[in-house]
């Protein structure tokens, strides 16, 4: 019986070397294990998609463009229909006033008609700017042409306003008498046309400002 117990003792007892080997293996296993991935929390705000405000500006451009079309073509149509014939006349002279009797009014009709035609042709480019807010080429072209049309309409409205002023008030220094006391309807119609033309010029200025804002890099 003693010999059996002596034979089982070495199996139950582990040597210090084997314990060190097992402990070294555990340490190596922990060292070889991949460290847990650290969760990185970003404090940077997610950028919101830009371009929505540019699309809104393009829609505003389209609406203003429609108003400018109505004002320019309305001014040309009103001035083109300005005519008055007084009910009295002499044997050699008939009192008649018409828009084409004045070169400034002729230029007025041409300028406002040309501006209205340009604004109609510019509508497709304005729609392209709505569909593609970041496009630069059509918007830059519209800015350049809007500036030219604004200068043309402003010149026509200013020259016509000078004639209308003289028709209402005359000029004592130049011995020009006022004719609006006789041609009341003619002066009223031409005054309305000049006001409509100045409205068109103001809307063209608004278009230039809106297009410049749309071209700004956000």
Swiss-Prot record:
Q: Name one GO biological process term.
A: cell-cell junction assembly
Compartments (UniProt record): Cell membrane
- One Pfam family per UniProt: CASP_dom
Which regions of this chain are Extracellular-facing, per the record's topological domains?
80-106, 161-192
| Quaternary structure and partners | Homodimer and heterodimers.
Q: What does this protein do?
A: Regulates membrane-cell wall junctions and localized cell wall deposition. Required for establishment of the Casparian strip membrane domain (CSD) and the subsequent formation of Casparian strips, a cell wall modification of the root endodermis that determines an apoplastic barrier between the intraorganismal apoplasm and the extraorganismal apoplasm and prevents lateral diffusion.
Q: What is this protein called?
A: Casparian strip membrane protein 5
> What organism is this sequence from?
Glycine max (Soybean)
């Amino acid at each position: 019986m003693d010999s059996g117990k002596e034979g089982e003792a070495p199996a139950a007892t582990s040597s210090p070397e084997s314990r060190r080997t097992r402990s070294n293996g555990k340490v190596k296993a922990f060292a070889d294990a991949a460290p847990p991935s650290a969760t990185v929390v970003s404090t940077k705000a997610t950028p919101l998609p830009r371009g929505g405000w540019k699309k809104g500006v393009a829609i505003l451009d389209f609406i203003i463009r429609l108003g400018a079309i109505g004002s320019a073509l309305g001014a040309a149509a009103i001035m083109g229909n300005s005519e008055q014939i007084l009910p009295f006349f002499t044997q050699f002279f008939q009192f008649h006033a018409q828009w084409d009797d004045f070169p400034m009014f002729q230029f007025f009709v041409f300028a406002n008609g040309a501006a209205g035609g340009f604004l109609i042709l510019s509508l497709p480019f304005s729609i392209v700017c709505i569909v593609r807010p970041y496009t630069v080429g059509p918007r830059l072209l519209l800015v350049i042409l809007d500036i030219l049309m604004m200068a043309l309409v402003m010149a026509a409205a200013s020259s016509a306003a000078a004639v209308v002023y003289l028709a209402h008030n005359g000029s004592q220094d130049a011995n020009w008498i006022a004719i609006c006391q006789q041609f009341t309807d003619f002066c009223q119609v031409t005054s309305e046309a000049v006001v409509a033309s100045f409205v068109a010029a103001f809307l063209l200025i608004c278009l230039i400002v809106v297009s410049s804002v749309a071209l700004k890099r956000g």
